[in-house]
A protein has these predicted regions:
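Glycine- and charge-rich intrinsically disordered segments
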Residues: 1, 241-250
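Compositionally biased non-globular segments, especially hydrophobic aliphatic-rich helices
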Residues: 33, 37, 236, 245-248
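Mg2+/Mn2+-dependent nuclease catalytic core
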Residues: 106-241
Length: 250
């Protein structure tokens, strides 16, 4: 177990990188975004073109809900503005399920303080074996079951079931679920590598203007999503290595 403090670095391209244990590594979300299919990347670019400002608005909304969850879990006023109340309503019952909290954006137990950055208000988990890093939203227990949770806001529900042909909304929800599940599986593995604590279950808490969802992912499913993510992490590092080789030859 290392005691080196992790740091986050924003690259000129907008990708997040971390310096952890003396190694530079990408964020989990960077790996997932960079290894999307060309069709998926083109679809995102087209959506952004047709919905100017929507991506930034979604990011601001997500940050507000994340902060509300963090405040609520600490017994503080959530402080969620009226603008986002439709997304906030319905989330707290899922947060109330937890009877033990180990992490809310950063460690709540002293033996994990080596995961904090120097400013101590942020913390990360990382894998020196697979070279990636990131920040889980919530880690705790419900009746002794070790659970990692992630907060998501969306204009439409997530779906763990592959949709019927032609169901574009359902397909979007399925893709979001798949991406989030891989993200959480990656965090779970990195947390275990850094602390020895391995979550049994993951929970995606999704809030939309009309409803909220709590989607559980069991151990077997997490193991499968972990394998998928590790393939993408390997692909990412191969892509970066090829770029470095090309640059050095010019």
């Amino acid at each position: 177990m290392t005691t080196d403090k992790p740091y986050r670095i924003q690259t000129p391209s907008g990708y997040r990188k971390y310096l952890c244990s003396g190694l530079y590594m990408p964020s989990v979300t960077t790996v997932l975004s960079a290894t999307e299919t060309e069709k998926a990347k083109a679809g995102l670019r087209n959506w952004q073109k047709n919905n100017p400002g929507a991506l930034e608005a979604a990011s601001t909304r997500g940050s507000a809900i994340h902060l509300g969850c963090e405040n609520y879990l600490r017994g503080l006023d959530p402080g969620v503005s009226e603008e986002y109340q439709d997304f906030w309503n319905g989330i707290t019952p899922y947060l109330d399920w937890f009877d033990t909290l180990h992490w809310s954006e950063r460690p709540l137990r002293p033996d994990w303080n080596h995961l904090r950055s120097d400013d101590r208000e942020v913390a990360y988990v990382w894998s020196t074996e697979h070279l990636y890093a990131g920040c889980p939203d919530l880690i705790g227990e419900i009746g002794g079951v070790k659970i990692m949770a992630d907060f998501k806001t969306s204009n439409a529900p997530y779906s763990a079931v592959f949709p019927e042909k032609g169901d574009r909304l359902g397909f979007g929800g399925f893709r979001k679920y798949q991406k989030c599940a891989q993200q959480m599986a990656a965090y779970r593995l990195a947390l275990a590598e850094r602390t020895g604590y391995k979550c049994d279950v993951a929970l995606i808490i999704v809030s939309t203007p009309e409803t909220s969802q709590g989607i559980f992912i069991d151990t077997d499913q997490l193991d499968r999503f972990e394998a998928k993510f590790l393939k993408r992490a390997q692909q990412f590092h191969e892509m970066e290595s090829a770029k470095d080789t090309e640059s050095s030859s010019q």
